[in-house]
Design a protein with these regions (language model features):
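Second-shell loop/turn segments in exported
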Residues: 99-103, 142-150, 165-170, 222, ...
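C-terminal solvent-exposed extensions
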Residues: 72-82, 88, 101, 135, ...
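Entry/capping segment at the start of metal-dependent catalytic domains
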Residues: 2-8, 26-120, 313
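Flexible, polar/acidic helix-loop-strand segments at domain edges
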Residues: 184-270, 351-352
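Amphipathic, coiled-coil-like alpha-helical scaffolding segments used for oligomerization/assembly
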Residues: 147-214, 287
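N-terminal post-signal-peptidase region of extra-cytosolic proteins
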Residues: 75-81, 94-101, 107-112, 146-161, ...
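Extracytoplasmic/secreted envelope proteins and their assembly/folding machinery
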Residues: 108-110, 141, 145, 153-161, ...
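Extracytoplasmic
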Residues: 87-90, 106-111, 120-128, 139, ...
Length: 353
């Protein structure tokens, strides 16, 4: 009987002991979580400081934050908000500038919309044809490329927003002559050169050599090969062979894609070195803090795929463009291209497939 009377206290003792163990385990888990949190905060803090140092060489430009001045209107924003992914996409204007000397005005030789799509884990590069016939505030209808010469990045952003009902508030720009240095600093890019492109590439290599008063070194021949910065830059400038300006914008996207691929290929350890090299050659309206936040967001979302497209879409403009008052333009069906562009950016429906 005495044994039976002693059983309940043993069960109670085991219960108390188990509770103590659970409390100790929870405390230990909390300590581990706190330690991990402190380590993460330290890494983020140190990483942010390091990132600020790396990005300090970038040239920052202030542009208007007034949405109306940038061509962003309430009715357009409301139309974009119907897309479920609206808050997961950031659109930035990217300009490739053709400025051969500091005293010469900049012209946007390449115009792209970079869409950071965290919903589909993609970076989308959409080329907008430079000769697209668009409305430019204060200048009537003209070629898209002229907006930058008329009013710099601010007017170019406004032109994109007003003609394509977008919400772009920031831009990044690279002078094509700096692009040569960027590509060389990364060890060149591998491209497949067609036979009919060789002569044209060498023509532009010669032109650049004459402008910069440097030796002329022509490309030897066609085929897959690693191009220097000057050779790759000359490749992007070809427009008189193949499918003219359409193929030219395709070449620009190919080089940019190869360049981004090269940076990715280097891995995270070589990223600081590469960013430090590239920073002085970039102009942007984005602040350093904004860029760090964007980069961290990209990293955490696992956004790695790069995809390209082109606007206007085939079938929405007259073949070969159109002469208007003695000048060649590319008029296009605006409503259809707005629809194609929005569906691509926000619904991941590729317009060129």
């Amino acid at each position: 009987m005495s044994k039976n009377h002693q059983d309940p206290p043993k069960a109670k003792s085991r219960s108390v002991s188990a509770k103590k163990k659970r409390r100790r385990r929870k405390k230990r888990q909390r300590r581990i979580l706190m330690s991990i949190t402190l380590i993460l905060l330290f890494v983020i803090g140190f990483g942010s400081f390091y990132a600020y140092t790396m990005l300090s060489g970038i040239n920052h430009d202030k542009i208007s934050k007034n949405k109306t001045e940038l061509g962003i209107y309430k009715e357009n924003i409301n139309a974009l908000k119907k897309y479920k992914t609206y808050n997961k996409v950031i659109n930035i204007a990217l300009f490739g500038l053709d400025q051969r000397s500091e005293n010469e005005p900049s012209r946007s030789d390449a115009v792209m919309i970079v869409s950071i799509d965290k919903a589909n884990k993609k970076i989308k590069l959409t080329s907008v044809m430079r000769d697209s016939y668009v409305a430019i505030d204060g200048h009537g209808n003209d070629k898209l490329t002229h907006a930058y010469a008329y009013g710099g990045p601010e007017l170019s952003i406004k032109t994109l927003n007003e003609n394509f009902n977008l919400n772009i508030t920031d831009y990044a720009a690279v002078n094509f002559f700096d692009m040569e240095k960027i590509i060389d600093s990364l060890g060149g890019v591998t491209l497949d050169i067609k036979q009919y492109e060789v002569k044209e590439i060498n023509k532009y290599i010669k032109e650049i050599a004459d402008i910069t008063k440097t030796p002329y070194t022509p490309l030897a021949g066609a085929g897959s090969q690693t191009l220097t910065g000057r050779q790759a830059l000359s490749y992007t400038r070809i427009r008189s062979v193949g499918n003219g300006d359409f193929e030219r914008t395709s070449r620009q996207r190919i080089v940019l894609e190869a360049l981004l691929g090269k940076i990715k290929e280097g891995g995270i350890l070589s990223l600081p070195k590469n960013i430090s090299k590239l920073a002085p050659m970039v102009r942007t309206s984005l602040g350093t803090g904004e860029m760090i936040k964007m980069g961290l967001s990209l990293f955490l979302s696992g956004t790695t795929e790069i995809e390209t497209a082109r606007i206007p879409v085939d079938g929405t403009f007259p073949d070969g463009g159109k002469m208007i008052k003695g000048t060649w333009y590319l008029p296009f069906d605006k409503e259809k291209n707005i629809e194609y562009l929005h569906e691509y950016i926000y619904e991941d429906v590729h317009p060129n497939k």
